[in-house]
Structure formats: structure tokens, C-alpha cells
Design a protein with these regions (language model features):
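Core beta-strand-centered patch of the WYL/Sm-like small regulatory domain
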Residues: 1-82
Length: 82
């Protein structure tokens, strides 16, 4: 059964909502595009990150993959995609 966070992200994908969340102790602003599972069965999000912080050397905006179990403080926002 999908996690609560996965279900919230699924709704954001379906409704084309921007999301904000914390991942790896960094604030992120992104457009969620694809939800699925890794080869080992972990829930994963593929998103276009447009704001917030990112790993050293990564530029914004850009495509990112996040493990859903590492996403905290998830909120979605009304408004269209880019």
C-alpha cells in the first residue's frame, strides 16, 4: 500500500500542483512529474526542481529524483505548472 506522502504526491501530479518539501535537510520547490518504485521497491519521485536548495554543484532549475520516504513537510500549492 502506498505511503501517505506518496498519495499526496500522486494528487499533486494529477492536479499539476507545485510542491514544497524538505529532503536531505534541504528546502525544495518542485513540480512533481513521475511517481513510481525503484528496482528494490522504494517509492520514488521524479520532479523538476525550480527553487530551494540543492546538492553542491547542481544547478537550478533541473530534474531530480527523490526517495519518497525522505520527504518531510510536504505541501502543495495551487497554480499551474511552468
Amino acid at each position: 500500500m502506498p505511503s501517505t506522502t506518496y498519495r499526496l504526491l500522486w494528487r499533486a501530479v494529477r492536479e499539476r500542483r507545485q510542491v514544497t518539501f524538505v529532503s536531505e535537510r534541504k528546502h525544495r520547490e518542485a513540480y512533481p512529474v513521475v511517481l513510481g518504485y525503484t528496482a528494490t521497491g522504494e517509492e520514488a519521485l521524479f520532479a523538476y526542481q525550480v527553487g530551494g536548495h540543492t546538492s553542491a554543484g547542481d544547478k537550478l532549475p533541473g530534474w531530480r529524483c527523490f526517495y519518497v520516504n525522505g520527504i518531510r513537510e510536504l505541501t502543495s500549492h495551487k497554480g499551474g505548472w511552468l
